[in-house]
UniProtKB/Swiss-Prot annotation:
Annotated Pfam families: Ribosomal_L10 (PF00466)
Organism placement in taxonomy: Bacteria, Fusobacteriati, Fusobacteriota, Fusobacteriia, Fusobacteriales
Highest taxon in the source lineage: Bacteria
Keywords: Ribonucleoprotein, Ribosomal protein, RNA-binding, rRNA-binding
A GO molecular function held by the record: large ribosomal subunit rRNA binding
Role description: Forms part of the ribosomal stalk, playing a central role in the interaction of the ribosome with GTP-bound translation factors.
Organism expressing this protein natively: Fusobacterium nucleatum subsp. nucleatum (strain ATCC 25586 / DSM 15643 / BCRC 10681 / CIP 101130 / JCM 8532 / KCTC 2640 / LMG 13131 / VPI 4355)
One of the GO biological process terms: translation
InterPro entries with a match to the protein in the record: Ribosomal_uL10 (IPR001790), Ribosomal_uL10-like_sf (IPR043141), Ribosomal_uL10_bac (IPR022973), Ribosomal_uL10_bac_type (IPR047865)
CDD domains: Ribosomal_L10
A cellular component term, taken from the record's GO annotations: cytosolic large ribosomal subunit
Protein name stated in the entry: Large ribosomal subunit protein uL10
Similarity section: Belongs to the universal ribosomal protein uL10 family.
Gene from which this protein is expressed: rplJ
Membrane-spanning residues: none
Length: 170
């Protein structure tokens, strides 16, 4: 690759790293093209992005982004990157689901290597725990449901009292 092209790629990666709430590092070797296409589509739908870049260029981009943690042990071999822009859980969830399916099929391919979440390096275990969390929308709906529960009960109680008074007045 020409030096200018590499500089442009690094600049692009720096922008993505700064914009992302989370980045998941994946060993993508052995994944089928149709599975990768489906993963990319799923990521786009959830405000995330999946791409493959050279490890050396990604290391340079991390340094230029101001990331102080070392990712040398993670950035070895075939590495793909899943960036989460809107929801930090989305890329972890999508990648984890595919990795879990591959492990269930007893295939030793497509493994999570680690991640980067809001300024700090995270382990494989932490990425898996993040993937098990509900999405932001699910959390908001759970919160709203718990807030509306008491109001709903109060409304039912007042209707029941009104019906009871109406029944005794007749």
């Amino acid at each position: 690759m020409a030096t200018q092209v590499k500089k442009e790629l690094v600049a692009e990666l720096v922008e993505k790293i700064k914009k992302a709430q989370s980045v998941v590092f994946v060993d993508y070797q052995g994944i089928k093209v149709n599975e990768e296409t489906l993963l990319r589509k799923q990521m786009r739908e959830n405000g995330a992005e999946y791409l493959v870049a050279k490890n050396r260029l990604f290391k340079i981009a991390l340094k230029e982004s101001g990331v102080e943690d070392s990712f040398d042990e993670i950035l070895e071999g075939s590495t793909a990157f899943a960036f989460g822009y809107n929801d930090p859980v989305a890329p972890a969830k999508a990648v984890f689901d595919l990795a879990k399916a591959k492990a269930k099929a007893k295939l030793d391919v497509f493994k999570i290597k680690g991640g980067y979440l809001t300024g700090k390096k995270v382990s494989v275990k932490e990425v898996e725990e993040l993937a098990k969390l509900p999405s932001r929308e699910q959390l908001l709906s759970m919160l709203l449901n718990s807030m509306l529960g008491p109001i709903r009960k109060l409304a039912y109680a007042t209707v029941a009292i009104a019906d009871k008074k109406e029944g005794s007045a007749e």
